[in-house]
Curated annotation (Swiss-Prot):
Marked site: Transition state stabilizer: E349
Cofactor: Mg(2+)
Increases basicity of active site His, annotated site positions: D302
Annotated positions binding substrate: H33, R59, E349
Lineage: Bacteria, Pseudomonadati, Pseudomonadota, Gammaproteobacteria, Enterobacterales
Quaternary context: Homooctamer; tetramer of dimers.
UniProt cross-references to Pfam families, sorted A to Z: MR_MLE_C (PF13378), MR_MLE_N (PF02746)
One GO process term, biological-process aspect: amino acid catabolic process
Keyword Lyase attributed: yes
Enzyme Commission numbers on file: 4.2.1.90
Gene: rhmD
Alphabetized InterPro entries for the sequence: Enolase-like_C_sf (IPR036849), Enolase-like_N (IPR029017), Enolase_C-like (IPR029065), L-Rhamnon_dehydrat (IPR023444), Mandel_Rmase/mucon_lact_enz_CS (IPR018110), Mandelate_racemase_C (IPR013342), Mandelate_racemase_N_dom (IPR013341), RHMD-like (IPR046945)
Name of this chain's protein: L-rhamnonate dehydratase
Length: 405
């Protein structure tokens, strides 16, 4: 009889943070909104706060970067470690060190689903429908997958059953789709800059932006709009029709997450052939089931916010059962290892984090070492063949561990 590998137990979990309101600004990392000055990601982008003039020019003005990066590390009894990053900062550290640790330490490194279920159920009374708590649980879950892969010597995508394609092809999110085309991406997604409080003039301005970019990029390059929860159904419908002559591929996250009836109506009224997408800020499996029932075309969970890889796999199954695509919100290696195993993810998102979108920069720079970026708009599966998620933690970053246990 062949020997069966004896897996170690988890000895300790630790949590650090960097950036956010209580540390240095512009740290980047897991909180990719935490960028320095003159960055496209903070340049007059439409948000739910844009209706207040004091907060319409900059997303950082209303505090989009106050959380900072959470780093969770899990250590096995044999000394091997796994880690992950997300957006939860110092508050996430408290949740990990003072609550979730009891469900992690002492478990076998393969007990990922058990730990995940216990974390979800133990936080129901204060987690609501996602948010900070789910970001934290996601980070723990990803760290556990990283550790498991390193212990058994396999990349995470092979733990999920293996690749269904040889490479991942990407579209780029940023202010310059024309530059993205030159870099080999299949499409470009731009943020909208105006909302319902701007009236029809706002629609005309954003439609003109799409028209200008269509002229620069040509007919065969995808163009999309990211509306970041900033619109209502009427405005979104009018904007979609205003952009239809320029072959807009999809219109994304027009409405706040819980407006399911609004998404159903928007899908009914959108121009024929234009897709409606959402999911970045949905935070539970149940919310994605309801979102799927609206009939939208693509669900876009963030693996660092929706419950981790364990939940992302379940979301992909929901989407597949309805013939929908699941294209995760850009989350680098954490989604790469998942989507290369999903048959309903024919492409993926790469978030441009260079200030003017003119260069390729790893999304979670500088917190991850050896983080891959697309080459000619693609990443081959061989790039993902290192154990775990294949990246290392940059311990030269200003990491703080505010709590212990």
């Amino acid at each position: 009889m062949e020997n069966i590998m004896t897996l170690p137990k988890i000895k300790q979990v630790r949590a650090w943070f960097t950036g956010g309101a209580t540390a240095e600004k512009g740290a980047g990392g897991g909180d990719y909104h935490d960028q320095g000055a003159n960055h496209w990601i903070d340049d007059h982008i439409a948000t739910p706060m844009s209706k207040y003039r004091d907060y319409e020019q900059s997303r950082q003005s209303f505090g989009i970067n106050v959380l900072g990066t959470l780093v969770v590390e899990v250590e096995a009894e044999n000394g091997q470690t796994g880690f992950a990053v997300s957006t939860a900062g110092e508050m996430g550290c408290f949740i990990v060190e003072k609550h979730l640790n009891r469900f992690i330490e002492g478990k076998c490194v393969s007990d990922i689903k058990l730990i995940h279920d216990q974390m979800l159920n133990a936080t129901l009374y204060y987690s609501g429908s996602g948010g900070l708590v789910m970001n934290t649980i996601s980070c723990v879950d990803l760290a556990l997958w990283d550790l498991f892969g390193k212990v058994v010597g396999l990349p995470v995508y092979k733990l999920l059953g293996g690749a269904v394609r040889d490479e991942i092809q990407f579209y780029a999110t940023g202010a310059r789709p024309d530059l993205a085309k030159e870099m080999g991406f299949i499409g470009g997604k731009m943020p909208t800059h105006w909302g319902p409080h701007d009236g029809d003039a706002g629609i005309r301005k954003d439609a003109a932006m799409v028209a200008d970019m269509r002229e620069k990029c040509g007919e065969d390059f995808w163009l999309m709009l990211d509306c970041w929860m900033s619109q209502d159904v009427n405005y979104a419908t009018k904007l979609a029709h205003a952009c239809a002559p320029y072959n807009l591929k999809w219109i994304e996250e027009c409405l706040p997450p819980q407006q399911y009836e609004g998404y159903r109506e928007l899908k009914r009224n959108a121009p024929v052939g234009m897709m409606v997408t959402s999911g970045e800020h949905h935070g539970t499996l149940q919310s994605f089931r309801t979102l799927s029932e609206t009939g939208i075309d693509i669900m876009q969970p963030d693996v660092g916010w929706c419950g981790g890889l364990t939940t992302l796999v379940e979301i992909a199954a929901i989407a597949k059962s309805r013939g929908q695509l699941v294209v995760p919100h850009g989350s680098s290696v954490y989604s790469h290892h998942a989507v290369i195993t999903f048959t309903n993810t024919p492409f993926s998102e790469f978030l441009m984090t260079s200030p003017d979108c003119s260069t390729m920069r790893p999304q979670f720079d500088p917190i991850l070492l050896n983080e891959p970026v697309p080459v000619n708009g693609r990443i081959h599966k061989s790039v993902l063949d290192k154990p775990g998620f294949g990246v290392e933690l940059n311990r030269d970053c200003n990491l703080k561990r505010p709590y212990s246990h």
